[in-house]
Design a protein with these regions (language model features):
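N-terminal polybasic/positive-inside topogenic patches
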Residues: 145-152
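Flexible, solvent-exposed loop/hinge segments and secondary-structure transition points
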Residues: 1-143
Length: 153
């Protein structure tokens, strides 16, 4: 079962709280299993230019079922995915901040976060993805509190 709107709202709400906790306004996007945008929020004060980036991070993470931070590592010059950012009509984003969302071990969507440093974007996305996974991604399941150092999905 794909990420539904109620799932996306809960993920975004939790991500907004994490972003506020670190003092960084952000754009937060959630995509479904087809990589389609389910929901997006631009926090007050978040960069307008990061709207598109957050959406593309969610798409990229779902399209390849990998954290965009990890894809970025593999897409550097000499890496096995060098040049991938130019594929898919420019929809691929290789900045940190995109993380797959899993339900019962299967990728069902992704979160994309943009507006801070790469480390901040990744930390907010990772904490929310980890909470989604620990709640088994079931609609209505409570989120567990994620620590910033959690290894992720």
């Amino acid at each position: 079962m794909s990420v539904r709107l109620q799932d996306a709202r809960r993920v975004i709400d939790a991500a907004e709280k994490k972003a506020a906790q670190i003092g960084q306004p952000m754009n937060i996007a959630v995509a479904d299993e087809g990589g389609n945008l389910v929901a997006h929020v631009r926090m007050d004060g978040a960069w307008i230019g990061s709207v598109d980036i957050s959406i593309k991070k969610a798409y990229t993470s779902r399209a390849f079922d990998i954290a965009t931070k990890d894809l970025a590592t593999h897409s550097q010059s000499g890496g096995q995915f060098f040049g991938i950012h130019a594929s898919n009509n420019g929809r691929i984003m290789i900045f940190a901040g995109g993380i797959p969302l899993k339900r019962d071990g299967k990728v069902v969507g992704a979160i994309g976060v943009s507006g801070g440093s790469g480390e901040q974007d990744h930390a907010v996305a990772e904490a929310r993805a980890a909470a989604f996974c620990r709640g088994h991604g079931r609609p209505g399941a409570p989120f567990a509190t994620a620590s910033p150092g959690h290894a992720g999905p």
